[in-house]
Amino acid sequence: MKLFAGNSNRVLAESVAQYLNIPLGKASVRRFADQEIFVEIQENVRGEDVFVLQSTSYPANDHLMELLIMIDAFRRSSARRITAVLPYFGYARQDRKPGPRTPISAKLVANLITEAGASRVLTLDLHAGQIQGFFDIPTDNLYAVPVIARDVKANYATGNCMVVSPDVGGVVRARSLAKRIDAQLAIVDKRRERPGESEVMNVIGDVSGKDCLLFDDIVDSGGTLCNAAEALLNKGANSVTAYITHGVLSGGAVARIASSKLKELVITDSIQPTTAINDAPNIRVLSISDLIGEAIARTAAEESVSSLFD
């Protein structure tokens, strides 16, 4: 087994390598003057079980091309099996046609990864579960909920917690956390007027006096979370914390979160945190390196991955 990484999240890759007690593989990923990407694998991988870790986060297109070119390089170097490890799967929000004459880009990206030569895929908290079916190769969708549940139990009196889904579509995800910490569930019903903006309409459930835990897969602009936090506090919530797997946090999201009524935003390192995120007073980062590392170890040993979440 050998683990390699592109440039998108080397800090996480190094932590995963440390968990696995193996060195991070030697590979050069660089750009020519015209910004074409060039990859050189700097050690023998013939007959090896290769894992390449790369989040296709901002800049999504560059990081996706890095991944595809790395997979091609491993295939042409006679690797026995190539597993693409995507802690964050970019383009996942384009999983259906929102209107006429529009693409399903998540399916296209799945096709590209497969055609490049990947044998299987490991990813984390896909935006929509059906994206697993976009791949024609084995695909394991991991869940951050065990990591998040441990953090909640370490920092909150769970008897007073209420897990809140920020929209109706996230109810199943929120329920999984609520079951693990034995908490009740509430829902924020919202109407999205335009991309990046949302209007909170109603809170379904009695949150009065509760420490509310918003749980979702992606935070991008932060508008939904900030509006949801305000709505919950207006309904009498004691405090509002958000637990989100993927901290995209584009544009002015960090400043928006910092000035919001959220007690804290807790994200994972599926996307490498920026300096602004690390310096933000009310944003905290949980590492999913042990979860990713254990999934890689079990995949390499042909053991069950799903039992991680039993």
From Swiss-Prot:
Pfam families recorded: Pribosyl_synth (PF14572), Pribosyltran_N (PF13793)
GO cellular component terms given for this protein: cytoplasm; ribose phosphate diphosphokinase complex
Superkingdom classification of source: Bacteria
Binding site for ATP: 34-36, 93-94
Residues reported to bind D-ribose 5-phosphate: 192, 216, 220-224
Needed co-factor(s): Mg(2+)
Active site: 190
General function of this protein: Involved in the biosynthesis of the central metabolite phospho-alpha-D-ribosyl-1-pyrophosphate (PRPP) via the transfer of pyrophosphoryl group from ATP to 1-hydroxyl of ribose-5-phosphate (Rib-5-P).
Alphabetical list of HAMAP family matching this protein: RibP_PPkinase_B
Name listed for the protein in its UniProt record: Ribose-phosphate pyrophosphokinase
